[in-house]
From Swiss-Prot:
The lineage of its organism: Bacteria, Pseudomonadati, Pseudomonadota, Gammaproteobacteria, Oceanospirillales. CDD domains: NAD_bind_m-THF_DH_Cyclohyd. It catalyses: (6R)-5,10-methylene-5,6,7,8-tetrahydrofolate + NADP(+) = (6R)-5,10-methenyltetrahydrofolate + NADPH; (6R)-5,10-methenyltetrahydrofolate + H2O = (6R)-10-formyltetrahydrofolate + H(+). PROSITE patterns: THF_DHG_CYH_2. The keyword Iron does not apply. This is Bifunctional protein FolD. InterPro entries: Aminoacid_DH-like_N_sf, NAD(P)-bd_dom_sf, THF_DH/CycHdrlase, THF_DH/CycHdrlase_cat_dom, THF_DH/CycHdrlase_CS, THF_DH/CycHdrlase_NAD-bd_dom. One of its GO terms (molecular function) is methylenetetrahydrofolate dehydrogenase (NADP+) activity. Catalyzes the oxidation of 5,10-methylenetetrahydrofolate to 5,10-methenyltetrahydrofolate and then the hydrolysis of 5,10-methenyltetrahydrofolate to 10-formyltetrahydrofolate. One of its GO terms (cellular component) is cytosol.
Length: 280
């Protein structure tokens, strides 16, 4: 069996070409440029790299980014003040608070302070609830990117048994709800799940979203399954042991180059959508 490679890098590039045309049209029509504001608290090197990548993606499609860097000592109140300032800035169309924040900051409180119409990373409780009820909302960027990638390759989810390993509020939980909304039958597993291999073996579609390198072993996954790996760890490995799978599954996302590019691409797409709504 030759597995289909779900190439997120290629899909993101093709989408960027369309987004660039839409941004150009919007700028010509309104004289305004969509802006994504990114907030980085502290000096975590990985977080700084991710923020830089998001700014670069904005520029590739003709959008602007506003990079806000706050010191490690920032308090919850100070961060809330900055978020409220951005909420009230009509020139800003999307707000991203880079995860994680320092321990003294109430991350959930700060996420939920982001105005719903600027929550382009899909991190607020309100946004999650609206998405879950199939109401208009911006989806969490990584699971929404996964859904877009599967759709780009005509992967049908209706009636499939999807096993999501991981339950984080910005990945596992919204991923499960999006799959449920696509009429899949969903099983959620996590660190307290008993007999994890037995659940994984039942999956038509397996989503690794647990944040532990190669926790999900190749011999747990049945032939012909669709494998989505949302993890990335040093050495270019994900949450799933991909190597032995490539000649016996139906499709898989490579690591890197699968889910990651679609996460950033979805953030840019949703920022443009927000700009279109706000600028008219």
């Amino acid at each position: 069996m030759t597995a289909l490679v779900l190439d997120g890098k290629l899909c993101a590039k093709e989408t960027e070409n369309r987004l660039q045309a839409q941004v150009t049209e919007l700028k010509e029509r309104t004289g305004c440029t969509p802006i994504l504001a990114t907030i980085l608290v502290g000096a975590d090197p990985a977080s700084a790299t991710y923020v830089k990548m998001k700014g670069n993606a904005c520029r590739r499609v003709g959008m602007d980014s506003m990079a806000i860097e706050l010191p490690e000592s920032t308090t919850t109140e100070q961060l809330l003040d900055k978020i409220n300032e951005l909420n009230n800035n009509p020139d800003v169309h999307g707000i991203l608070l880079q995860h994680p924040v320092p321990a003294q900051v109430d991350e959930r409180l700060c996420f939920d302070a982001i105005a719903a119409h600027k929550d382009v990373d899909g991190v607020t409780c309100l946004g999650f609830g609206r998405m879950a009820m199939k109401e208009p909302a911006y989806g969490a960027a990584t699971p929404a990117g996964i859904m877009r990638l599967l759709a780009a390759y005509d992967i049908q989810l209706e009636g499939k048994h999807v096993v999501v390993v991981g339950r984080s509020p910005i990945l596992g939980k919204p991923m499960a709800m999006m799959m449920l909304n696509a009429n899949a039958t969903v099983t959620m597993c996590h660190s307290r799940t008993q007999n994890l291999p037995e659940f994984v073996k039942q999956a038509d579609v397996i989503v690794g979203a647990v944040g532990k390198p190669e926790l999900i072993k190749a011999d747990w996954i049945k032939d012909g399954a669709i494998v989505v790996d949302a993890g990335y760890h040093p050495g270019g490995i994900g949450d799933i042991e991909l190597g032995p799978l490539k000649d016996r599954v139906a499709a898989y996302t490579p690591v890197p180059g699968g889910v990651g590019p679609m996460t950033i691409n979805t953030l840019i797409l949703q920022t443009l959508e927000s700009g279109l709504k706000q600028l008219g």
